[in-house]
Amino acid sequence: MRAPKTILVVAIFLLGSSFQDPQIRVEVEAVNLLVTVTGDKGRFVTKLVQQDFQSYEDGRLQEVTNFSQPTDLPLQIGLLIDTSSSVRLKLEFEKRAASDFLYSVMRDKDRALLVEFDTGVSLIHDFTRRPGSIVQSIKNLRAGGGTALIDAIYLVSRDKMFGGTDRKTVVILSDGRDLNSRHTLQEGIEMAHRAGVIVYAIGTTRFGTNLDDKGERTLEELTESTGGRAFFPYSTERLADAFDLINEELRTQYSLTFVPSNTKRDGKFREIKLKLPEHKNFNIRHRRGYFAPSE
């Protein structure tokens, strides 16, 4: 999502030397949505046209002004890896799967960054178009400390994902436990909405016998509210399958734009609902809404 042209957003990193005082100007004329449609047995549907979609904001029909079929718009990928003590035994499997994912998903115009989070949040590698460079950084990750999952989402969305027309995606690899964040779950979701970020998560809660329902709920809420999806493989061997599904989904998304009929600058959350009147058996997934600009 982009914000109105007249809005100037200044974001300053608060994470020390890893984050360097950027000033970000965000200009937005319309609401941009990335949309995933699935049909029978969860298969991706890729042949729909603009006339198939109806867009509603707070229950009011909106005119779709721009549309493209499964898009090759450049990707901005934020890879967030949990390196807390609770994932110590799983980390090596996670590192290999994450490395393979970057090699498979990134194309020439795509960019990715790497963040690790434990007790704090650290930018390990800034945006690059070279997956091999990030993979080398992934190899050096070590486990230890608490967990600041929500802070990682909040700070990456705020300080690295605002502005531009690229598709913005955060992929989390974590058990979903959060012990050290200063920001709440809702604050993390709100910042992702404001930055137009879709969140995907691969939860490691089902590895072994110790399930963490709270961790799973956190990951599900983060992903569902932003139009993404959470995966919970039962073994480290299935990590690659989850990454493959994320890769496939990122390459089968529709891009849709509408100009809101409600022009109030009240800063309120606007609920978005897309419908496929002639294809009611299809499932459609997108972010739940956006925040209007404020004076």
Language-model features: locations:
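Scaffold/interface architecture of coatomer-like assemblies
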Residues: F19-E295
